[in-house]
From Swiss-Prot:
One of its GO terms (biological process) is protein folding. It comes from Thermosynechococcus vestitus (strain NIES-2133 / IAM M-273 / BP-1). The keyword Chaperone applies. This is Urease accessory protein UreE. Belongs to the UreE family. It comes from the Bacteria. Pfam families: UreE_C, UreE_N. CDD domains: UreE. Involved in urease metallocenter assembly. Binds nickel. Probably functions as a nickel donor during metallocenter assembly.
Length: 144
């Protein structure tokens, strides 16, 4: 088992390269037992305040392994509107509910939630279930 303790901003040539696909929720956890995409046993033991993003690299204390983080496809809702203003209103209402949200110019993506889906559909928005990578905004006060 490799214990990953820190971010690695630059690639290390002699380290073993692995990949780790995590859901949006898993990327927010500091402590996590998991397996790399290659099947290696991993333990995340990260400092406080780190939210992993796709493309981040993690390393163990000895720099024997470098693990690149990827967004794992997960159940999501894709929200589309007939006008930009309707999409903006949807983002406003979702923000009031503190719903983690991935924002694009022509659609919003959020974790699958039947109650929120019903609310959005009642507002006249088009909501589609998709299994897709989910990368919500990190928030205004995030320091990473």
């Amino acid at each position: 088992m490799f214990t990953l303790t820190q971010l690695c901003p630059t690639p290390l040539e002699n380290a073993r390269q692995l990949h780790l696909s995590l859901t949006a929720e898993e990327r927010c956890r500091r402590r996590l037992h998991c397996h790399s995409d290659e099947g290696e046993s991993l333990y995340l033991k990260l400092p406080r305040g780190i939210t992993l993003q796709p493309g981040d690299r993690l390393r163990d204390e000895d720099a024997t392994v470098i693990v690149t983080v990827h967004a794992k496809p997960e159940p999501t809702l894709k929200v589309m509107a007939s006008t930009p203003l309707d999409l903006l209103r949807a983002a406003y209402h979702l923000g009031n509910r503190h719903v983690p949200l991935e924002i694009h110019t022509d659609y919003l993506r959020l974790g699958a939630d039947s109650v929120v889906q019903t609310m959005l559909e009642q507002r006249g928005l088009t909501v589609t279930f998709e299994v897709a990578p989910f990368c919500p905004e990190r928030g205004a006060y995030h320091a990473h």
